[in-house]
C-alpha cells in the first residue's frame, strides 16, 4: 500500500507550524550553523522547479546539522523592491505594494508546501519600513565617511520613452530602447555614487580566505580588474600647460606608440582640437551620443574616429603622436585616454590600418612575423627601443617605469577596472535616499532619529519627464522647510534593488531590533554565514556589493567579521526535458504545485537531489520524478504493512545480517551529505533498502537509524515513519546516527595469484588465514592448476593480504 502523501505532508507541516519546531534559539550553549539561500524576488509567476533545488540543498544541511547538535539558523525573506513591480503597476494601474504583498503570500504558500525548515519568525522583507530604516542608516554612514557622493554620470537618456527615463546599457540596441525603439542619448545626469573602489584591494585579497568556487572568485577578480602598470604624461605640442595622462600596463612598449586616442567626452578634447578639425570633432561627438558603452566597446564593430589636429609628445622618444578621438575609448575607464601601439595590439592595429597611421615594431617576433598584416601579441626581446633593447618583458617594464619616474614623466600605478557603484535609480519602487537639497546649495542627511524616511503612497507612477523619479511629482513630499524657514527638496532618486540584498543576512540575526541593525553579541555568535547557496548569475554584482557593505560595517565596528559568507555553493540550472532553459515563451516551465499535488513534496525534493551533482545543470525528466516516487513507496512498504502498522519483521532482535551494510550506509551517507554529494548519498540509501528487502528481520535500531538518514532529504515521510516506530517527538532534533568502525572491517580479502610472475587467478581467503592455508588454497585453485599441470612447484611466496607467487617449471 502506497503512502498517502497529501495527508502525511499536510499533517507534518501543520505540526511544525503549531509547535514552532524550527524557531531558532539565540542561546549560545551549542555550536552554531548559519545556512541560507539567496532570497528570492517575489515575482508574479511564483516558484518554478528551479527554486526548490537550492532550497532543498540548504534544508538538508540545516536538518543534518540540527540532528548533529548544532544551533541552526535557517531563515527566509523577500528581495521585494525592484523594477518589475513598478512596470506591472504602470501597465495595470495596481499599486506595487499590493502587487508585491500578493506575490509574497503565494511564494510563501509554495515554499511551505515543500516542507522547508525555515524559521519564519525571522522573515524579512526589504520593502518593510522597519527594514529599510537600516538600509537608509547604512547609506548615511557611507555618506558621513565620504563613501557616498554625487556626481555627473553619463547615462542613457530616452526622452520619449515612458515620459522620459534612464535606461540601462543592456536595454539599448542600435541607439534605441529595446522596448518601443525610442531614441537614446548619452547625457550627463546627477547620480548618487558609492565609492566601492576604496575597498578594491581588500575585495580581491580577502577572496583567498573564502571557501568559494574558484570560477566565482576568478569572476570577481576579473570584474575588479586589478592591474599594475604606469601612468605616463604626454605633453601636447604647442600647449605647454596641457598634459594628457595615460595608464598602460605595458610602459615597455612606449617606443612603439605611434598615435593617441581620447574618449570623445575627454575634458581635453575641446582645448586641444584645432579650428580646422573642430567641425569634424563636433559632428563625431554628436554621432556617438546615442551609443551605449556596450555598443562602443563591442570588439566586432568597425573602429571609428576623428583626428583632433593636435599632437602629443612621446616622453621617451620625443616623437610627435597624432591625437585622435574614438568611441571605443571610454571616459569612465582608466584616464579616458590611450597610447596606441599598433604593432602589438590587435585593436590598435585595426585602427591604424583603417586610418593609415604608422606602425612601429618594438617586440622581436618570429621569422614570419609581418606587423603590416597583423599585430604581434606574444612576448619577445625588445627592439627599436633605445635603452630597453634586448630586454625581456618584465625587465623592460621596470626599466621604463624607472626612467619615467626619474624624468617626472610618469610613475608606477595600480589600476582597477572596477568603477564606483552608481547607486541611484530614477524609479518609484525603491528605498528613498535620506537626503535633502537646500536652496542655499547645502546637502544634508535626514536626521537618524527621523529614519525611516518612508516611501510615500503615489497614485501616478509615470516618470517625471525630467529624468527624475516619479517621486518628483509629489510636491507635498518633496518640498520641505526647516525651522528657520529655509526651503529644500528631498532627494527624488531611489536606491537600486541591490541595496536591500547587500546586508539582509545581518538582519536575520535580530530581525525586530529597532535600536540597531542587530545585537552585537548575536552578530558575534552567528556571523559569518557558514553556507550560502544561490545561482551563479549573482556571482559578481550581488556578492561584490554585499562584501563591500560588510567590510564597511566591519570598519565601523558594527559587524565582527571581514567577510559575510564563508562557504558559497552555486546550484546548477534545471533545464527543460529538451535541455533548453525553462521559460514561459518556450512553454516548458514546470510548476512545483502540480508536482507536489500529484507526487508529493518529498518526491520533488528527492528527485531534484538525485538528478545529478548539485552544481551541474540537468534536464527535467518525468520518468525520473516517477522513479523517485516509486522508491518512496518502496521505503514505506519496507516498514509499514497494508493496515498502516509496523511490520512484524521490525524487531528488537539483531541477527547480524544487516550489520555491515547499515554501518557502511551511516558512514557513507553522513560523509556525502556533509560534502553535499546528495545524489551519491541517495544512491547508498537505495542500496541499503535493496539489502533490507533480502533479510528476514529488520532490527529496530537499524530502522530508526535509516529513517534518521533519510529525514533531511524527505522529512515528511521520515516524520511519519518515526512516529510509527513509536516516537512521540519530532525527528528533527533526534540524534544523528553513528557507525561502528569495527563492523566495516572486511572479513575476507582478495589476493592476486601469480604463476611465474604472471597473474593467473584471484583468490578470496579469510583475513586471518595462515600462510599454509593460503598456499594450500592457491595450489588448489582450478585456474592455477591449469598453469602448473606437468610442472614441479619449486617455491610458493605468500605476501599476506596482497599476493601469492608460485614458481614452477
Curated annotation (Swiss-Prot):
Annotated GO biological process: leucyl-tRNA aminoacylation
GO CC annotation: cytosol
Catalyses which reaction(s): tRNA(Leu) + L-leucine + ATP = L-leucyl-tRNA(Leu) + AMP + diphosphate
CDD domains, per database record: Anticodon_Ia_Leu_BEm, LeuRS_core
Keyword field: Aminoacyl-tRNA synthetase, ATP-binding, Cytoplasm, Ligase, Nucleotide-binding, Protein biosynthesis
Enzyme kind, highest EC tier: ligase
Main subcellular location: cytoplasm
A Pfam family assignment: tRNA-synt_1
Domain of life: Bacteria
Motif annotated as 'KMSKS' region, chain positions: 581-585
InterPro entries: aa-tRNA-synth_I_CS, aa-tRNA-synth_Ia, Leu-tRNA-ligase, Leu_tRNA-synth_edit, M/V/L/I-tRNA-synth_anticd-bd, Methionyl/Leucyl_tRNA_Synth, Rossmann-like_a/b/a_fold, tRNAsynth_Ia_anticodon-bd
EC number: 6.1.1.4
Subcellular location(s) of the protein: Cytoplasm
GO molecular function: aminoacyl-tRNA deacylase activity; ATP binding; leucine-tRNA ligase activity
Binding site for ATP: 584
Motif ('HIGH' region): 40-51
HAMAP family (UniProt xref): Leu_tRNA_synth_B
Protein family membership: Belongs to the class-I aminoacyl-tRNA synthetase family.
Alphabetical list of NCBIfam families matching this protein: leuS_bact (TIGR00396)
Protein name according to UniProt: Leucine--tRNA ligase
Amino acid at each position: 500500500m502506497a503512502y498517502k502523501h497529501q495527508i502525511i505532508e499536510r499533517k507534518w507541516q501543520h505540526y511544525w507550524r503549531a509547535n514552532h519546531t524550527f524557531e531558532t534559539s539565540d542561546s549560545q550553549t551549542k555550536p552554531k550553523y548559519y545556512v541560507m539561500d539567496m532570497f528570492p524576488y517575489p515575482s508574479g509567476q511564483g516558484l518554478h522547479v528551479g527554486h526548490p533545488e537550492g532550497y532543498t540543498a540548504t534544508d538538508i544541511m540545516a536538518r543534518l546539522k540540527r540532528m548533529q547538535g548544532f544551533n541552526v539558523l535557517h531563515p527566509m525573506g523577500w528581495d521585494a523592491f525592484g523594477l518589475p513591480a513598478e512596470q506591472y503597476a504602470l501597465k495595470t494601474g495596481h499599486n506595487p505594494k499590493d502587487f508585491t504583498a500578493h506575490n509574497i503570500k503565494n511564494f510563501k504558500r509554495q515554499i511551505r508546501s515543500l516542507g522547508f525548515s525555515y524559521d519564519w519568525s525571522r522573515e524579512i522583507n526589504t520593502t518593510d519600513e522597519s527594514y529599510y530604516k537600516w538600509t537608509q542608516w547604512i547609506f548615511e554612514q557611507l555618506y558621513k565617511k565620504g563613501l557616498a557622493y554625487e556626481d555627473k554620470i553619463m547615462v542613457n537618456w530616452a526622452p520619449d520613452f515612458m515620459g522620459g527615463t534612464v535606461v540601462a546599457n543592456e536595454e539599448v540596441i542600435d541607439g534605441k530602447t529595446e522596448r518601443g525603439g525610442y531614441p537614446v542619448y548619452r547625457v550627463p545626469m546627477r547620480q548618487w555614487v558609492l565609492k566601492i573602489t576604496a575597498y578594491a584591494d581588500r575585495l580581491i585579497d580577502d577572496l583567498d580566505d573564502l571557501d568559494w568556487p574558484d570560477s566565482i572568485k576568478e569572476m570577481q577578480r576579473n570584474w575588479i580588474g586589478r592591474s599594475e602598470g604606469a601612468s605616463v604624461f604626454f605633453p601636447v605640442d604647442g600647449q605647454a600647460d596641457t598634459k594628457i595622462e595615460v595608464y598602460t600596463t605595458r610602459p615597455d612598449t612606449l617606443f612603439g606608440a605611434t598615435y593617441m586616442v581620447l574618449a570623445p567626452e575627454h575634458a581635453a578634447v575641446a582645448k586641444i582640437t584645432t579650428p580646422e578639425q573642430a567641425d569634424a570633432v563636433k559632428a563625431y561627438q554628436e554621432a556617438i551620443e546615442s551609443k551605449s558603452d556596450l555598443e562602443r566597446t563591442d570588439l566586432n564593430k568597425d573602429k571609428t574616429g576623428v583626428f583632433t589636429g593636435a599632437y602629443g609628445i612621446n616622453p621617451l622618444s620625443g616623437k610627435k603622436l597624432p591625437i585622435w578621438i574614438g568611441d571605443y575609448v571610454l571616459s569612465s575607464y582608466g584616464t579616458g585616454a590611450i597610447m596606441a601601439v599598433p604593432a602589438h595590439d590587435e585593436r590598435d592595429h585595426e585602427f591604424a590600418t583603417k586610418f593609415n597611421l604608422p606602425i612601429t615594431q618594438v617586440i622581436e617576433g618570429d621569422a614570419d612575423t609581418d606587423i603590416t598584416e597583423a599585430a604581434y601579441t606574444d612576448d619577445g626581446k625588445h627592439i627599436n627601443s633605445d635603452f630597453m633593447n634586448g630586454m625581456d618583458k618584465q625587465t623592460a617594464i621596470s626599466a621604463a617605469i624607472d626612467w619615467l619616474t626619474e624624468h617626472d614623466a610618469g610613475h608606477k600605478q595600480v589600476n582597477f577596472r572596477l568603477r564606483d557603484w552608481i547607486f541611484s535609480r530614477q524609479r518609484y519602487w525603491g528605498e528613498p535616499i535620506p537626503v535633502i537639497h537646500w536652496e542655499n546649495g547645502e546637502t544634508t542627511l535626514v536626521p537618524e532619529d527621523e529614519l525611516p524616511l518612508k516611501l510615500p503612497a503615489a497614485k501616478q507612477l509615470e516618470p517625471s519627464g525630467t529624468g527624475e523619479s516619479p517621486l518628483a511629482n509629489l510636491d507635498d513630499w518633496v518640498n520641505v522647510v526647516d525651522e528657520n524657514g529655509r526651503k529644500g527638496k528631498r532627494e527624488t532618486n531611489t536606491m537600486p534593488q541591490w541595496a536591500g540584498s547587500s546586508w539582509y543576512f545581518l538582519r536575520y540575526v535580530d530581525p525586530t531590533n529597532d535600536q540597531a541593525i542587530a545585537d552585537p553579541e548575536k552578530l558575534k555568535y552567528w556571523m559569518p554565514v557558514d553556507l550560502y547557496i544561490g545561482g551563479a548569475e549573482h556571482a559578481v554584482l550581488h556578492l561584490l556589493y554585499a562584501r563591500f557593505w560588510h567590510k564597511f560595517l566591519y570598519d565601523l565596528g558594527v559587524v565582527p567579521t571581514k567577510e559575510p559568507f564563508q562557504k558559497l555553493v552555486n546550484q546548477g540550472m534545471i533545464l527543460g526535458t529538451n535541455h533548453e532553459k525553462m521559460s514561459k515563451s518556450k512553454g516548458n516551465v514546470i510548476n512545483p504545485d502540480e508536482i507536489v499535488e500529484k507526487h508529493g513534496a518529498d518526491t520533488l525534493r528527492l528527485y531534484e537531489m538525485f538528478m545529478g551533482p548539485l552544481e551541474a545543470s540537468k534536464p527535467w525528466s518525468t520518468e525520473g520524478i516517477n522513479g523517485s516516487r516509486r522508491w518512496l513507496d518502496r521505503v514505506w512498504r519496507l516498514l509499514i504493512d497494508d493496515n498502516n502498522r509496523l511490520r512484524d519483521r521490525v524487531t528488537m532482535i539483531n541477527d547480524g545480517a544487516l550489520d555491515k551494510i547499515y554501518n557502511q550506509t551511516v558512514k557513507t551517507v553522513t560523509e556525502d551529505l556533509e560534502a553535499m554529494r546528495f545524489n551519491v548519498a541517495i544512491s547508498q540509501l537505495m542500496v541499503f533498502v535493496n539489502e533490507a528487502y533480502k533479510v528476514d528481520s529488520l532490527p529496530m535500531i537499524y530502522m530508526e537509524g535509516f529513517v534518521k538518514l533519510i529525514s533531511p532529504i524527505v522529512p515528511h515521510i521520515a516524520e511519519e515513519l518515526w512516529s510509527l516506530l513509536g516516537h512521540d517527538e519530532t525527528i528533527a532534533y533526534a540524534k544523528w546516527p553513528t557507525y561502528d568502525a569495527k563492523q566495516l572491517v572486511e572479513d575476507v580479502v582478495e589476493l592476486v595469484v601469480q604463476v611465474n610472475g604472471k597473474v593467473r587467478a584471484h583468490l578470496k581467503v579469510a583475513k586471518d588465514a595462515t600462510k599454509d592455508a593460503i598456499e594450500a588454497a592457491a595450489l588448489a585453485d582450478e585456474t592455477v592448476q591449469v598453469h602448473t599441470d606437468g610442472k614441479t612447484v619449486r617455491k610458493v611466496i605468500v605476501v599476506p593480504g596482497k599476493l601469492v607467487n608460485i614458481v614452477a617449471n
